[in-house]
Amino acid sequence: FAYHLPLDCHPLHGNNAALGRLMGIEAPEALDPGDPGTPVFRGQLAESLTVQGLADRLSVALDRSPLVIGEGDVTSLAWCTGAGQGYIDLAADAGADVYVTGEVSEQTAHVALERGIAFIGAGHHATERYGVQAVGSLAAEALGLSHEFIDIANPA
């Protein structure tokens, strides 16, 4: 059975929902609600930040320094945890000020600059640690279990 993509995409307990909360998004939603196969989320910040301000927030939350391309003010975000760098055009088409994902490819930097969208690469592992913790807590509460998340640092 497959669990990775459903864990990424779950609107309440998934990796994307959790990363949205860490960034300060109060109401994250799927970028394309009509296509559940697109694991990109979007949302609005309650108060505008600079791209570097958002990167600093992520650095504290994820305990790592992200790669930042671009600058300017951010209110509208799109993001996809893990290896979501291929969705940057969808984020730009949706009018996001910044696109956040786990990985970066060489072309991602060029696409960001050409499309005028800021980009933050925050680490594949770092962006996907929180969905499994949320599901663990949910299962523990529902089934009366105890659980422990063992985080093994990964530079990727």
Residue ranges and their predicted role:
Residues 1-156:
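Active-site catalytic microenvironments in core metabolic enzymes, especially phosphate/sugar-handling
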